[in-house]
């Protein structure tokens, strides 16, 4: 058995986990802790404190850290922290011979292979093809996209910046939304991430509200107004995207319901755009924090219709398996699996 250290490092919270891996690549969780990232000047003292508290007689041989941000030449700088991470320095200061830094969405790609059936909700069974490409898309704070290609006997994960591609409206309401965002932000283009993400949920709500296309409820209106008043502040006391999503699932706010309907339509369409580019008959996996929370709405929506509504290509997309990832720790699982490969 080999002892591994896996980490999911965010600007706010970091989760560290010790894992043992057998020759069959089966993972066994040993110890886990969560930390507030800002409480530490660097990752090294956090890991050192973690290992002392874990009180494990052996020392990790390999480590992989999933980073909320780009990784360039084995280095990473987190957006909301002063940390600058370098694999060579980390290996030396932590006495761990093999260390890797990967983008957090790449970690999701690796994590797919550590999920059980209970960790997935299948929207479309499709016709799975062994060794075919796999696609991942995930709306959360932003919109992540990536893909996996089989090379030899293993899949290699390739993150992308597809979430920053142009938002492509398909009907009059979406064209109005595009115009609204262009005017509001005084910009020349709108990325799909401005619509299909947590910030997109709020933007759609504001659009429908300002165009008086639905009536606000006092409860959600107060949350959104508070958030708008706190614009520019580092710390916000409310999460309007979460409040809107919850109200939509509960059916307690008509404007929130319409917001999620437009959001899910756009989400399905963008997932279909990604699928067209790759034809991922190995599966298209929907990650991110939003989909599991609004699963009842997605299940009973036109997500799949918008996913497959691509003209003459529709029959191809109807054969692609589509799954929603329910396990919020898929990135941590992926970091452990990535460490096992080192």
Swiss-Prot record:
Substrates-to-products reaction catalysed: D-glucose + ATP = D-glucose 6-phosphate + ADP + H(+)
EC number: 2.7.1.2
Compartment list: Cytoplasm
Span of the signal peptide: none
InterPro entries tied to this protein: ATPase_NBD, Glucokinase
UniProt superkingdom: Bacteria
Single Gene Ontology BP annotation: glycolytic process
Keyword annotations of the record: ATP-binding, Cytoplasm, Glycolysis, Kinase, Nucleotide-binding, Transferase
Major localization listed first in the record, in broad terms: cytoplasm
Residues the entry annotates as binding ATP: 7-12
Disulfide bonds: none
GO molecular function: ATP binding; D-glucose binding; glucokinase activity
GO cellular component: cytoplasm
Similarity comment text for this entry: Belongs to the bacterial glucokinase family.
Name under which the protein is recorded: Glucokinase
Organism per entry: Trichormus variabilis (strain ATCC 29413 / PCC 7937) (Anabaena variabilis)
